[in-house]
């Protein structure tokens, strides 16, 4: 499964080769197709497994009573990190699958994709944005953090010795910076203070 994620992450569904998978896994193509029938079957299985595994990690990492946005984001990243400790290419694979444009692949994973999106929506829906003056800005800040995290992940994956724990530590630094920016945006600027 981890090998398949790695290959699919690098190549996407369209360009992923079953020849590469069987060569790297040291299994026969017959055995691969015995269990999965075709490339789409392998892709759907790996996607399904990845989402279920990630959701399990999120369910243990995210406190159901937490309402602080930045703590929720940290807990989500903790769950992702735990998942990537088992399967280093899990999150990059899921990120790449989000951008997939092959119709048959999209249809094959649509239900699980929806389940994952709903899980994230449920987590972030309970975030209390009321303590920030500009809640819309905090939503944009969260989107900016998601893109930053994906970018960091893409950079670190290219390194030969990818370590999810080191990526996690770097992500926490960015989350702390974002918290400070959001909290600062809720306070009046120097200009607003002098005008009063």
Write out the residue ranges for each language-model feature:
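Short, small-residue-biased leader/transition segments that mark boundaries at the very start
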Residues: 2-6
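Amphipathic alpha-helical packing segments from all-alpha helical-bundle domains
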Residues: 52-60, 67, 71, 82, ...
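Short helix-capping/turn signature of helix-turn-helix
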Residues: 36, 95-102
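Hydrophobic/aromatic-rich alpha-helical bundle segments in the mid-to-C-terminal region
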Residues: 91-96, 106, 127-175, 185-196
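Short coil/turn segments at alpha/beta junctions that flank glycine-rich nucleotide-binding fingerprints
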Residues: 11-14, 65, 87
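Helix-turn-helix
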Residues: 10-41, 45
